[in-house]
Amino acid sequence: AGAQPPELLANGEVVMATGWNGRFFNAEIGEGSPIAQVWDGQILDYEYFTLVKDGPNYSNGNAMKVLREMTSTEMLAGSAKYIAYAPWRNSSIGIIKAGEPWYKDGKTNMVPQMPTAPENTKSYILMDAIFWADNDTEISEKWEAMKAGL
C-alpha cells in the first residue's frame, strides 16, 4: 500500500497523491522517478512506542534499554542516511546538518527533504486520530466507491 502512490505518479496514472514522505523521497531521489513532493498542506502525524507493562523485558529493564538505544540521538540521525523521515530528537538534526550531504548517495542533503524542515512546516495540518477513529469506515467506503467510478 505504501509503494502504490509513488508508483501511480511515476506511471502517469494519477497527477497527485498522498502518502508517506519516505516512499516519495525514495522514488524521487533513490530511483529517479519524475515526481516531486509538495509540502504545502502536508499532514503531520505522530508515531509512538508502547511497552508491555510487567512483561518479561519490562520488568528486567531490557525494554527500556532497547528503546533508549533505538531513540538515541546518534541512532536517529543514522537512520536518516536511508530515509527522509524526521528524527524524533532535535539533537539528531545537528548531526545530520554537520554531515551533509547525509543521504547514502553522498550528494543529497537530507534536512531539506524532511517534513519537519522549517521551509516544509509553514502550512501543515495536524492528523486528528479521533476524527479518523470516528469516521474511517464511512470515508473508506466513499473512497472505494469513488475509485470504482474512475
Task: Describe these PLM feature segments.
Residues 1-38:
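Ligand-binding pocket segment of bilobal, Venus flytrap-like solute-binding proteins
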Residues 6, 10, 18, 64-71, ...:
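Non-transmembrane alpha-helical segments in soluble domains
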Residues 13, 21, 28-31, 70-74, ...:
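Sec/Tat-exported extracytoplasmic proteins
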Residues 22-26, 42-44, 56-57, 74:
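Solvent-exposed loop/turn segments at secondary-structure junctions
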Residues 115-150:
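Conserved C-terminal helix/tail region of periplasmic/extracytoplasmic solute-binding proteins
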Residues 52-120:
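Mature extracytoplasmic/periplasmic domains
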Residues 32-53, 104:
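Periplasmic-binding protein-like
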Residues 3, 57-61, 130-137:
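Soluble non-cytosolic domains of exported or imported proteins
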